[in-house]
Swiss-Prot record:
Subcellular location: Cytoplasm
Keywords from the UniProt entry: Cytoplasm, Initiation factor, Protein biosynthesis
Gene Ontology molecular function: any one: translation initiation factor binding
Domain PCI: 601-775
Sequence ranges of Acidic residues compositional bias: 16-52
Residue ranges that the Swiss-Prot or TrEMBL entry lists as coiled coil: none
Protein name: Eukaryotic translation initiation factor 3 subunit C
Feature: compositional bias, Gly residues: 1-10, 819-833, 845-862
Organism: Aspergillus clavatus (strain ATCC 1007 / CBS 513.65 / DSM 816 / NCTC 3887 / NRRL 1 / QM 1276 / 107)
Pfam family, one: PCI
Amino acid sequence: MSRFFYGGGSDSESSSSDEEELYERDEEEQSEEEESSEEEETSEEGSDDEEGGVTGAARFMRDMSESEESEDEEKTTVVKSAKDKRLEELESTMKLIDNAKKINDWAVISTEFDKLNRQIVKITQAGPTPRVYIKGVADLEDFVNETVSKQKSGDKKLNASNAKGFNAVKQRIKKNNKDYANLIDKYRKNKEAFLEGKDEAAAPAAAAPRVAKLERVEAPVDVPVADDEGFATVGRGGKTLQYTPESILKHLRVIVESRGKKNTDRLEQIRTMEKLLEVAQNPYQRIRVYLTLISTRFDLTSTSSANYMAPEMWKSAEQDFSSLLSVLENNRDYVVTEGVDEWEDDEKQPQVAAGETLYIPGSVVSYAERLDDELTRSLQHIDPHTAEYIERLSDEKQLYTSLVRAQAYVEGLSKAEKSDPKQDSVNRVVMRRLEHVYFKPSQVITILEDATWKALPSELDSGVTPRGKTGDVENLVLTLCNYLFQYSDGIIRARAMLCQIYFLALHDQYYRARDLMLMSHLTENISNFDVSTQILFNRTLVQIGLCAFRAGLIYEAQNTLSEVCGSGRQKELLAQGIILQRYSTVSPEQERLERQRQLPFHMHINLELLECIYLTSSMFLEVPLMAQTSSSPELKRRVISKTFRRMLDYNERQVFTGPAENTRDGVIMSAKFLAAGDWKKAAEMLNSIKIWELMPQPEKIKEMLSQQIQEEGLRTYLFTYAPFYDSVSVATLASMFELSEKKISAIISRMISHEELAAALDQVNGAIVFRKGVELSRLQSQIVTLADKSMALLEGNEKTLEQRTQGMANAFQRDQGAGARGGRGGGRGGHARGGARFPGQQGRRPGGQQFGGGALGGAIKA
């Protein structure tokens, strides 16, 4: 116990080395004891054989040759010390690295290099640094430099795993080789002489003194302290951590290398970087700390039990991001961009001369996108009917401000240097900004834009959307979309097109939205895009249908909404919920991805309102069509909306029908009143539905619905009672349906021109004259129907006959000759009743009539 638990007086490194030395001594003593015990056993066995003679199984081994006996005597057990074993492990690791270098496998090199550094720590604690290790790290550094030069020239490209391993080795090899700089220089001057010499310690001062005897040291007496003023952060080995401007890069290097590893206290790392911000002196140090700090805050999400970022941590990350942009805006000679090399020297700070620009690896747009994604993910997991959701939604203002600020920054980079990556960054942030405004009403966008530009510095401006031109909301959305049309392609361009169509449809510009949708040809190739774009397409399609309904275009609204609402999967197609089925074949991974694609509640389209509009539009089209087909059976029956027909049939099968309890029942009851000719009750029932209050200008919508019911009621009446009229006065119809005579004449003229009504309009007498003889009577209609069914049956039989008789030459000829028909002329002369039996015939055919069947019978027998 004494060698493991002893008092203070030395740090953890010296204690670990002392313990290893004790372990080595124990191993050597155990090996010596094993050797002595083996020698004693062999000597005892030999003495027993000499005394007792050869007995047992040993008598069968008398003819053993002397050479074999001598070989057994020469075999000895080689006992290696712990030092030799570690050297062998080191050499085997070096061989693995050399083999991986031959095949350019940087993933293996990175893993084995980490293992090599762990092994060398144990070896150097007990002695000098092996020269084979110096050779390995020097050659590895040369190989890294060679690979870097090949990458810059474009001769060699690495895949994702190799690139990750290469970057890790490149960062660590330079830092590692600084401790062995003198030995590496000696090796490179004369490699052969260096390897033949004796091992030397890398740094004489680094060798820890051996502790021959462990002494117990009493702990110092605790001194009471009034407050935390005397406390300091203690690091590994009991040393006090000091944060200085010179050590900032070293601390950041340690934090970056620990990313992704287990048992990493990220909260402690965040506190460390907050202290580093306090001691940072120049813009470069602050930028580097902010970049690492924001990334570490995002890493907290991956380790937490929740799938989204905590609101407090999100706000801290957003504030750090705003501070980073502020530093970059005030120091234009420091640029954060993608695709540049990182500064490797942690001991020396980079110096920027006048007129030069220092490029720092990072991505401002990626941070803005991550903030957006984390806010969306948070809104997905919060109950939308609570005050917490409203409070969380208010953070969208800060996010939108950060997006506009990031857009202005990357626009400046793109103007300074034209390149595809920089233009792609501008497109990405503009798309994010567009996705935050396309579904909002104009009043909300105006408030959001005003608050954003007030929060930004007065000298900051955007080239795409200048500060002074943001008052016109329609012009703002059009400008963002046109910019993406010009400079982007693929998915971003398609999404920009859909956002513009959605915005136009939301603001009652149906014809512009429809024309833009038709010209984009997205309906033809939307299946080639990703799922998120398909969801946006479905939302846009639904919004166009709602816009057509508000404009009174019933046929266009029903035709547009039928693709989404007719499937019965509105919730799934619009990403507003998941339909869980009992026998679903969806894997947990697919379900998780489906939940990630769900839209926040404030972006939802009201599904109850959507269903009500779809059923109402279907009612206006289906009820007159049902009346037309019932009075004219010769017309081909067609169904416009199967969903509406199914609901109507279900309601009619009910024995007792109560009052309407929901939106769906209200529409069905209104349809039944309309079909019965009572348009006033139909209008009253339809207008009593409370869902219309959710639409803009509900009184205007109800007035439009009443007018539509009057018109469709007139059409239904004419279709139903036209066979019983010779003529009818226009004034009578106008008084019945409370429409103007001009409107009645226009509706009837349209029906006559579409050949829906066999009549003529007498404008002199103001009457409608129906033509007789054009439409069939009920008996004639039944005869035509019977004839059609008979012809269909005959055609079916002929097709069956052709399929059965293919390849039969005499299919349409009856059997000829004696005995073909049988009969009673058999007699007793060996001929049974039913005719003679021919070879191969097995007696009398079953059945009473004995009909051969001709062609049809042969086909059946075949």
